[in-house]
Amino acid sequence: MRIFFDTCILYPRILRNIFLDIASQNFFFPFWSDHIINEWKYVYERKHKDKISELNIEILLLNARWPNSHISINKDHLDKIFLPDINDRHVLSGAISCNANILLTENLKDFPVGTLNRLGISPRSPESLLLQLYSENPELIKRSILNTFDKENKIFGQNFDIKNVFKSYNLKRLTNLIL
């Protein structure tokens, strides 16, 4: 599988790291674009203006770990893409540019199924994809999720409550499977 990440997958951190941990086990290959990275920076800076240098380091590390994931979008697609929000065309263009099977986003309403299916792309929410991956390999997905939380807890010196984090990420059905 080839999956293009919308900004809402790269930010927040724990969700991004769950998907990247799963990707590192060859379940799929992730992609993102310059525009997605710039949106991530914009959103992050609005909330954490004093920590933008930390984000820049995080992005450098992300691109070093996944050098083939950061793509340039083919701007020729933009004029041919019709979505409810014109500002989301770059996301679909990114998915087209990397031949993605899946566009992973929280904003499904912005990406009509019919439009994407005609392009061979399936719009998916984080929960629907994680539930599918879990149904195919429950132990490995559960281990990826728990390992991600363990790493985050060590980095930040605190215990993130999986149930609360998943609730904030709209992963309510997955919570019952993991805990």
Predicted region positions:
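Metal-dependent nucleic-acid phosphoesterase active-site entry motif
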Residues: 1-17
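Acidic, metal-binding active-site segment of PIN/NYN-like and related structure-specific nucleases
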Residues: 88-122
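Acidic, metal-coordinating catalytic cores used for nucleic-acid/nucleotide bond scission
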Residues: 9-10, 79-87, 109-112
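Conserved beta-strand segments of alpha/beta enzyme cores
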Residues: 29, 70, 120-122
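Acidic, PIN/NYN-like endoribonuclease modules and their adjacent C-terminal/linker elements
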Residues: 108-179
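Active-site neighborhoods of divalent-metal-dependent phosphate/nucleic-acid chemistry enzymes
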Residues: 67-102, 136-138, 152, 156, ...
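PIN-domain endoribonuclease scaffold, especially VapC-family toxins
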Residues: 34-74, 148-166, 170-173
